[in-house]
Amino acid sequence: MTDEPADLLLRDPAYVARLLPLLRLATKWWFRSEVRDIDRIPDGGALVVSNHSGGLMAMDVPVIAVAFFDHFGEDRPLFVLAHDMLFTGPAEPVFQRAGFLKATRANADAVLQSGGVTIVFPGGDYDTFRPYTKNNTVDFAGRTGYVRTALANDVPLVPVVSIGGQEAQLHLSRGEQLAKLLQLERLLRTRYMPVTFGFPFGLTFAFPPNLPLPTKIVTQVLEPIDVRAEFGDDPDIAEVDAEVRRRMQAVLDDLASARRFPVLG
């Protein structure tokens, strides 16, 4: 893997503008999405740190993106640090034009140093394939690189918490053993082959993906965190990560307690 940053100009604002009506329809009509306090994302560069839900049909990015562009306007660029799996085959230019970048430190630095906003999901595939018993748990699988990235680029962390996306289908297992048997880490850089149950295919092993249920997705943007101001010039990375997750978990717990029924919200 190269350490050279991707070309940020591959993002096509006109293409993003054409996608937005479709994304708005999907997020607002099917998922009844609600994003609270999007205005907390400050001007300039910022690293948006979110939990990740929905498996192969994760809707975190469309939900956040629609709210972001509706509030800040389409002229403010938004980038997403994503798994290598999205950049294989003919799908690569599609995601690049939408502002997706491989989740590397070089790409994060390039966006943040340009004054841009980028979304990162530290938990990645581990998080989005979590079983239903962990639906309302913030777990980054021990990954703390996002803290170092914010420090290196002197930008705030903006925690974001979402609930409902993991209810789009029933996630039974991450399928680690199956993925190991199929050598998916070597082929696709993932250790998981999720076992899910949904409509119309019933029990599936990642493919074919089931139609996501119209679960209500509620997303809360937390107050930005100036890491140096709160933790000092040379903070303990693990301490910062633990505090970020603690704040996110507290909000997720509140959202879960306010949620009356699965899927319905």
Protein language model regions, located:
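A generic local structural motif
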Residues: 33-36, 65-67, 105-106, 205-206
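Helix-to-loop junction immediately C-terminal to a conserved catalytic motif
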Residues: 22-52
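Catalytic core of membrane glycerolipid acyltransferases/transacylases, capturing the structured
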Residues: 42-108, 114, 124-141
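Short, structurally constrained coil/turn elements
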Residues: 29, 72-74, 213
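A broad, low-specificity signal marking well-ordered, structured residues that form hydrophobic/aromatic
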Residues: 33, 46, 78, 118, ...
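Hydrophobic alpha-helical segments of integral membrane proteins
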Residues: 18-22, 26, 91-94
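Residues in well-ordered beta-strands of folded domains
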Residues: 36, 49, 81, 121, ...
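Non-catalytic C-terminal accessory region of glycerolipid acyltransferases
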Residues: 1-16, 109-265
